[in-house]
Design a protein with these regions (language model features):
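Conserved helicase motor core of P-loop NTPases
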Residues: 457-623, 742
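P-loop (Walker A) phosphate-binding loop of NTP-binding proteins
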Residues: 346, 374
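C-terminal accessory regions
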Residues: 620-622, 627-746
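N-terminal pre-P-loop "Q-motif" helix
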Residues: 321-337
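Accessory, non-ATPase domains that flank or precede helicase/AAA+ motor cores in DNA-metabolism machines
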Residues: 1-301, 309, 746
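Conserved helicase motor core of SF1/SF2 NTP-dependent helicases
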Residues: 357, 361, 365-367, 376-380, ...
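Hydrophobic anchor at the beta1->P-loop junction of P-loop NTPases
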Residues: 343, 371
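Conserved lysine of the Walker
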Residues: 351
Length: 746
């Protein structure tokens, strides 16, 4: 590790998003330095640690690993700093006059006797105080940076901590460093716990136990749970904190009193919710029950009215060339009769035909319809299937970005105060919708609006917490129409036929003689790799007339030789190998390359995107990229340390390198992440794994993602065991219970 000391002569480049800075440092020689600095000005004196590196384009650079600011030790250094622009309102000329008047005593005068600055022509008493205030703030920030770096906190995070707490940060860290996990994005319980250990906070601190309990609930929500039974919560938190279960149990009442948790009695056990999760379920239940009670103009249909509706349905069938079965006709009738309707059914059962008939019926009544789906891909499919514009739920609700300078968080413009101006709202792929998005949707639905929710309850539940569609059906409060008949055209597809057989637990003929459902028995990982590459690179693109990039590998697991992480490395080298014209960058454990297929792996409501014309002119812009959105890396800018990704609908997002931790390669993705998407061809490697994961539900979801053909590579026994395995990971949710409780009160 090399040490340097000098002053900054020139800021060459600064990325305001991540603090990445390129600057010239005068040490006697001019040295180009690169590192992360959130507040660096020309004239600053720095002590650096790092290493010299050789950049392929920009030559020799000093890569900074740590630094600290130094105060100028002579009058020349003070003048250089004051005149650099670091202090607003002080230029080179005024800096020279200040230093000429006070010499090497300048900084002491500013700190201890700032009123004396007014002795200089051009400086009023007010300006003198402003200069002193700016100097004090910069001094405080630098002291804080040094203090935080001592505990291993990165420069970027240190700045955010200082901006959040100011001079209070010392008291917060000494008393309760776990507060950082609540207040600052990017600091979770584990990072706060590491910091607390360095500071010397006792492992049995009340703050640590409470924060650990809340983290356990938050972590459980990542598994889809809305709550945990008390016994499960205590056991998990005790294991996390390495403390006796009694210590955990003692803190639960305190968290309840502080309104951090809601605890409900459940027989001999309890049910423990994070406060916001309990009220999210309760709010959804209340809004649904209120919508369900809304009297529509039709009210209770008389026989003559019902006959008139069905006659209109017959006319639509003739006009559109459709043939509805009795359940489909019933669905249309129920959509007219009720304010809420749930329409469910597997592939090939006519959900799209039913939706189209409902749309045509309400169009004929002169009503305004909104169509939506959880993802861009699902919305695009809905548009293509109906001929009616469908949007993502986020776009329909008009997501607006955060404004940190005003404290405004990302939010939806459409809400209870500004509801959607629609008579009918149809939402497809409801199995993907988690409790938080559903709550936001319901807030924007005004009384009198019909809400029609469509989905396949046999799909995997949402990635986020809750199992909204399943709970709505289980409540038995709302009208549900479950389509069951497989129509003739769908019967010609083995994908559809086999998917329905899976649901019934029926074994299928595993052969490669179908037109769209192939099984290739391959019982070793290297052989599966070889055939997967052949299928993607040569065979399937010709068979389904699609690009290799459109063919999706779906796997149950993240880890292991047939998990997402390993498969992506294998497929990247095949589909997007390195070449002289492609830039690449290693970020963490992932090598990203221009041309890579990637996926956003968490909701980010702050990310800004834009759509540009072929001439580079912005024609649309917005905020928000969401868990499961897939795109292509178009450009890697090594100098700016940014990555440009283009998503569906030509939305372009520029990520800083640190932000790329929210992105991963997507040549292979988990079956769970594929929900709501459809691909020309799907390849599923299945060679064994945990029984709870390798189940019928997972196989069904993966197979039904394929539009043209699905190919399973692996073990015959594993596929047969998955078909027979009904077990699913239970989700702890209670939306159905809340609905029934409120319906009983109504």
């Amino acid at each position: 590790m090399t040490q340097l000391k000098g002053f900054v002569t020139h800021i060459i480049y600064r990325n305001s998003g991540n603090g990445y800075t390129v600057f010239e440092l005068n040490t006697g020689d001019e040295i180009t330095c690169v590192g992360t600095f959130q507040s660096l000005e020309e004239g600053e004196i720095l002590e650096l640690e790092g290493d010299f590196t050789e950049h392929a384009v920009y030559g020799s650079q000093f890569k900074v690993s740590s630094f600290k600011f130094s105060s100028p030790e002579d009058a020349a250094g003070m003048e250089r700093y004051l005149g650099s622009g670091a202090i607003k309102g002080v230029g080179a000329s005024l800096a020279a006059r200040i230093v000429k008047r006070f010499g090497a005593d300048t900084f002491r005068i500013i700190e201890e006797e700032p009123e004396r600055l007014a002795e200089i022509k051009g400086i009023s008493e007010r300006k003198a105080m402003d200069i002193a205030s700016q100097m004090e703030e910069k001094h405080e920030m630098r002291e804080a940076m040094v203090y935080l770096q001592k505990y291993g906190i990165s420069n970027t995070l240190a700045v955010r901590i200082y901006e959040t707490y100011g001079s209070r940060l010392y008291r917060v860290l000494e008393e309760n460093p776990y507060q950082l996990a609540d207040d600052i994005d990017g600091i979770g319980f584990r990072k706060a716990d590491e910091l607390a250990a360095r500071i010397g906070i006792h492992t049995d601190s009340d703050f640590r136990i409470r924060s650990g309990i809340l983290y356990t609930l938050l972590h459980a929500s990542g598994e889809g749970h809305m709550y945990l039974p008390g016994s499960v919560l205590i056991r998990r938190a005790a294991a996390l904190l390495d403390l006796p279960q009694e210590a955990i149990a003692d803190q639960l009442p305190n968290l309840s009193m502080d309104k951090k948790m809601v605890i409900k009695k459940n027989g001999e056990d309890t049910i423990c919710y994070a406060f916001s999760y309990y009220y999210a379920e309760l709010a959804c239940a209340r809004m649904l029950v209120e919508l369900n009670q809304t009297m529509l103009p039709e009210g209770e249909l008389l026989p003559a009215q019902e006959e008139a509706i069905l006659k209109r349905v017959d006319q639509i069938q003739q006009q559109e060339g459709l043939m509805l079965d009795e359940l489909q006709r019933k669905a249309v009738l129920e959509s007219v009769r009720n304010s809420n309707l749930i329409l469910t059914g597997g592939p090939g059962t006519g959900k799209t035909t039913t939706i189209n008939t409902i749309i045509r019926y309400f169009e004929g009544e002169g009503l305004d319809l909104y169509l939506a789906a959880p993802t861009g891909r699902a919305a695009k499919r809905m548009t293509e299937a109906t001929g009616y514009e469908a949007r993502t739920i986020h776009r329909m609700l008009e997501l607006s970005g955060a404004m940190p300078e005003s404290g405004k968080k990302a939010s939806f413009e459409r809400n209870e105060d500004n509801p959607l101006e629609a008579d009918v709202i149809i939402v497809d792929e409801m199995s993907m919708v988690d409790i938080h998005l559903f709550q936001s949707l319901l807030k924007a639905v005004s009384p009198g609006t019909r809400l029609i929710l469509v989905g396949d309850v046999n799909q995997l539940p949402s990635v986020g917490p809750g199992q909204v569609l399943a709970d709505l059906i289980a409540s038995e409060v709302f009208p549900v129409v479950c389509l069951q008949k497989i129509f003739r055209q769908a019967q010609e597809s083995d994908i559809v036929v086999n998917a329905h057989r899976f649901n019934k637990g029926e074994q299928i003929a595993l052969t490669n003689k179908s037109r769209d459902f192939f099984f290739l028995e391959r019982n070793s990982v290297p052989v599966i790799y070889k055939h997967m590459v052949q299928l993607i690179g040569e065979m399937l693109p010709k068979y389904v007339k699609a690009s290799p990039f459109d063919i999706q590998v779906l796997t149950p697991m993240r880890k292991g030789s047939l998990g997402v992480e390993t498969l992506n490395g294998v497929l990247q080298s095949c589909l997007n190998p390195p070449s002289e014209g492609k830039k690449e960058v290693q970020l963490g454990d992932t090598l990203f390359r221009e041309g890579d297929k990637v996926m956003q792996i968490k909701n980010n409501y702050q990310l800004e995107w834009e759509v540009v014309s072929r001439y580079g002119i912005p024609i649309d812009k917005g905020v928000g990229i969401f868990n499961g959105d897939m795109g292509i890396i178009r450009e890697i800018d090594e100098y700016a340390q940014t990555v440009l990704v283009e998503y569906d609908e030509q939305r372009r997002v520029t990520y800083t390198y640190p932000q790329m931790e929210e992105v991963e390669l997507a040549y292979a993705i988990t079956i769970h992440k594929s929900q709501g998407s459809e691909y020309p061809a799907v390849i599923m490697p299945l060679l064994g794994g945990p029984r709870l994961l390798f189940n019928r539900n997972l196989l069904y979801t993966g197979v039904t993602r394929a539009r043209g053909c699905v190919t399973i590579l692996g073990s015959r026994e594993v596929v047969q065991e998955m078909i027979a395995n009904e077990s699913e990971s239970r989700r702890y949710t209670s939306l159905d219970v809340r609905i029934r409780e409120l319906k009983g009160e109504a």
